[in-house]
Amino acid sequence: MTMTTTISHLPTELLDEIISRVPLKSTRAVRLTCKNWDSLFKNRSFMKEEAAAKEGESRMIVLMDKNLFAMSIFFNGIDIDPSAEQRGKLTCLYDDSEQVKISQVFHCEGLLLCVLEDDKCSLVVWNPYWGQTRWIEPRYFSRIQNCYGRYMYVYALGYNNKSRSHKILRFIDGAFDFPFWYEIYDFDSDLWTTLDVTPQWFINFPPRGCYNRGVTLKGNTYWCAIRRKSNTNWFVDLDHIICFDFTSERFGPLMPLPFVRYTSGSLVTLSCVREEKLAVLFCNNATVEVWITTKIETDKISWSKFLTVNMYVDLLEGSFFIDEVKKVAMIFDIPMNRETVYIVGEAGNVKELHLGQPVDVDKHFSPLFVCSYVPSLVQIKQPPGCQRKQESSLEKRRCDDENISRLIAHEETYVVYGRYVPSRKKPR
């Protein structure tokens, strides 16, 4: 008599090993195969195994050429050449497998907020592990661009620390006489609300405002910022950090960055360390410094230096993350028109690894964004099945009559660095 062993009869350890080899982009299809597979993916012990990378492996999500990729960097010591493995393109934003172009992406504990490159700059929150999405349409989109051809909106994804309900912060706040507008989207109410904010700071400021990406930590988002004043010197005053608290829906005070002064040609960017700490990178062409927080709250912060290396590198983006155990920083950028990671050790050693093919940044520039990634069990709350709540007459007046009208009037008379595309307003 012939005995046949089915998948369901295999030992749990063997099933774990099989599923651990499934590429991130294929997890949704495998989970839909049967209830047993789905249950195994939901099991937290499996999640821990999946999150535990191989020796020397750093797993990440990378935005390259307006597409998202799952990627691993293998690094086993400064004396050994590093290598990269592209684990697959993440392509399930549309059910019909139509690939979309992504202009920006923001990370919050396994969830990704993607800003799409379409005529409305649609927003979608995505959990690649579950394959879940939630599409959100902005109320209005200004088509004014900065000198790098990027729209002047700033986004952040966070959550209420009491209810764990997710929210999206969106604002436009240019330099000098440009009107500002801060608004927040609540996943529970499915509504946008204008915030009462009179900023005493600049977050989206020239010349590198288009690169000032916020970092979300424990539900709140942090940015580098400068104090708002009429005679601001854009090149020397970047010496603060500011936090937006998604629970209170308020900004905290400006808090000092650990280095002395930001000088012309320098770059300052933020990163998250194991969802526990913030890190800040300071590069002034000749020196690279990385600092890590030892204490962080919405209104208090303290720092400890992680490493200092004398090296010349001309960074535009400076997306980075660090490995505290190996004492290295991985800095991602596009020098000489090629996506590259610099692996910098505390002893001053530097390894350089190319990730993709050369690109023509003059014709087709796309930012290189990287974040460390661990699959998340968080379910994205979907809009209520009943009729959507109506926004109040006060909010409608604040949105239409005040903010949108001001932006339209400003667009008709103002061009930022000579770049302007007619605006589109969502029908209301």
Swiss-Prot record:
Q: Which Pfam families match?
A: F-box (PF00646), FBA_1 (PF07734)
Please give the SUPFAM superfamilies that the UniProt record associates with this protein: F-box domain, Galactose oxidase, central domain
Give the matching InterPro entries. Answer: F-box-assoc_dom_typ1, F-box-assoc_interact_dom, F-box-like_dom_sf, F-box_dom, Gal_Oxase/kelch_b-propeller, SCF_F-box_component
Specify the F-box domain's residue ranges: 4-50
- Supply the name of the protein: Putative F-box protein At3g22421
**Could you tell me which species this protein originates from?**
Arabidopsis thaliana
Kindly list the organism's lineage.
Eukaryota, Viridiplantae, Streptophyta, Embryophyta, Tracheophyta
